[in-house]
Amino acid sequence: KSNTLIKDVKIKKRLFNKIYIYVDEYEVLFYNQNTSKYVLENKKEVLLDGIVVPTLINYVPDTKYNTFINKYILLDDKVKQKISEIKYDPNTIDEDRFFLYMNDGNYVYITLTKMELLNKYNEAITKVEGKKGTLYLDSGNYFEIR
């Protein structure tokens, strides 16, 4: 249990002297470019090599950062895998706004209060039939073709 990635370990002995070891690890959420560390679901930051996860490319204020992590954890894994880069991108109207670069060539504006809408990303992108553009889930729910 001294490994920072390990959440829990269970050891069970079964018939015929067989031992089963069950290891539960913390999920690696994203790479924080500001600290050059990977962020785990328990909000700890660790040094790792060769993990393919989204990259947070700029500073996020602590209160927004913690809320972002709490909301990000709830996203479907299939959606998380489509995110390439995460940028905190507030404007005068919305201090909770983020801009996501997606691996499929699209972009998404999202606000923390609507983060769960990202779970509908695949469904929304299917409806635009392969066109590339920006999905606005911050102030409205629409797709703008590039």
Regions found by a protein language model. Give the residues of each.
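Extracytoplasmic segments of membrane-associated envelope/inner-membrane machinery
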Residues: I19-P90
